[in-house]
Structure formats: C-alpha cells, structure tokens
Amino acid sequence: MYEGVHAHPDGNATVARFAETAASRGYDGIVVRNHGDAQTDYDADAVAAEYGVEVVSGIEIRTDDTAQASGLVGNYRSKRDIVCVHGGELNRFAVEEPKVDVLAHPMRDGDVNHVLAKAAAENGVHFEFNFGRVLRADGGKRVQAIQGLRKLRELVDQYDAPYVVSADPESHLELRSSRDLAAVGETVGFDREAITDGLAAWADIVERNRRRRSAAVVEPGVRIERADGETDDSRE
C-alpha cells in the first residue's frame, strides 16, 4: 500500500522523513504529489534504498484555468508516474481527461454528480477519498467533509468508478497507518476493505503508467509481435 504525501516546501516534512515514517507505518511506498508551484528536490533511489519504501514521483496540478490545466497535464504526463488534479473548479476537466490519474479531494471546493462519476469511470480517472479534514478539522468543516465522503462513496459505488484513499499528509506526523485509516473510515461508513483497496490503488496506477511507457507500447490498442513470436497487447 502507498500514501500520497505533500513534502517540503508544499508540506512540513522532507521526502526522506516521510519515507522513514511510511516504512514504520507498514507502507510499501509514498507518492510525492506536491503542487506544481511547490516542487521539491530529492533522490528517489537513495531514499528508497535507505528506508526500504518506493518513492514515486507525482504532481498535483492546481489552477482554475482549464486551458492551463490541459497544458500542464500534457507537460507532466511523461515526467511523472502519477498526475493528480487539484479538485474544485477543475472537477469536470479532470474526469474527462484520460491522461489524469487522480482527481484530488473533489468535494473540498467543488462537487461531484452522476455525470462526473460516469465520466470518471469511463476515462479511468480515480476519485480521491481524502480523509484529511475528517482527521484534522472539527465542527462544521469536519461534518461537511464526512457528508462529502459519503456522497462520493455512493456515486463511486453506483458507477464503479476507480478511487484512491489518502489522509493527505503535509507532515510525517499526519501520516496514518492503513489500520488507523481503516478505523477512521469505519466511523464514517466505509468498510476496511474499501480503505485498504484505495491505498493499494496508488501502486496499481504506478504500475499501469510505467507499463504504458514501456518500450513495447506504441499506442493504445496496438499489438506488437516480438522476436520470440509472442505478442504484447498494449490495450488497457
């Protein structure tokens, strides 16, 4: 299982500190998904070797302009293992763009309806069940976050849309174990399997994208005959 993190300067902890904590929490890897204006320098291989967890390069695109978002997605698609879009004004754009992997916290500054859920399912865009405000907010904001998660869960279930789960940690102190997240999920109506599946989905996305970029893949739907007579099918 993996967790998507915001490292310094987007957050308050270094990539190395996140990796160390993730290892102690039982994770197999972390996705560094800093916003585009807060990128960080790190040696993924060195950190992985030191702490025994994979460090995945990600990006969370944040803008209110769809044209700019489209350009940024195209720019980062070949440079990052996971491309996320910051939810809100870009919810519709994100679910209609197959190059987007994850629509991050779609309920925080926006909304999701049946049309968007269906589009996400058709285009393979993962909704994020973001438990950050459930864990760290209180009062009305926490209630609103819980209501948003429940509504999103109903739509995801109805349309069988893909999803990921995250505590959205900006500090290593906010990185929760899968067991802790599952327990929190149960208090707001999620079963444990849904939470662990959502944490595992980060790794599934990474594997899929790396496979798509492999030398054997020319374009979706193309079958390539290898020298040994076998075929590689690039269709997803």
Swiss-Prot record:
Q: Name one GO biological process term.
A: tRNA 5'-leader removal
Q: Which UniProt keywords apply?
A: Cytoplasm, Endonuclease, Hydrolase, Nuclease, tRNA processing
Q: What class of enzyme is it?
A: hydrolase
Q: Do you know which Pfam families this protein is assigned to?
A: RNase_P_p30 (PF01876)
Q: List the disulfide bonds.
A: none
Q: Which InterPro entries match?
A: Pol/histidinol_Pase-like (IPR016195), RNase_P_comp-3_arc (IPR023539), RNase_P_p30 (IPR002738)
Task: Give the domain of life.
Answer: Archaea
Single Gene Ontology MF annotation: ribonuclease P activity
Cellular component terms per the entry's GO annotation: cytoplasm; ribonuclease P complex
Please give the catalytic activity noted in the UniProt record.
Endonucleolytic cleavage of RNA, removing 5'-extranucleotides from tRNA precursor
Name the Gene3D superfamilies on file. Answer: Metal-dependent hydrolases
Where does this one sit in the cell?
A: Cytoplasm
EC number(s) from the headed UniProt entry: 3.1.26.5
Its predominant location is cytoplasm
Q: Which family does it belong to?
A: Belongs to the eukaryotic/archaeal RNase P protein component 3 family.
Q: What does this protein do?
A: Part of ribonuclease P, a protein complex that generates mature tRNA molecules by cleaving their 5'-ends.
The entry describes its oligomerization and partners as: Consists of a catalytic RNA component and at least 4-5 protein subunits.
**Listed name of the protein:** Ribonuclease P protein component 3
Q: Which organism is it from?
A: Natronomonas pharaonis (strain ATCC 35678 / DSM 2160 / CIP 103997 / JCM 8858 / NBRC 14720 / NCIMB 2260 / Gabara) (Halobacterium pharaonis)
Q: What is the lineage of its organism?
A: Archaea, Methanobacteriati, Methanobacteriota, Stenosarchaea group, Halobacteria
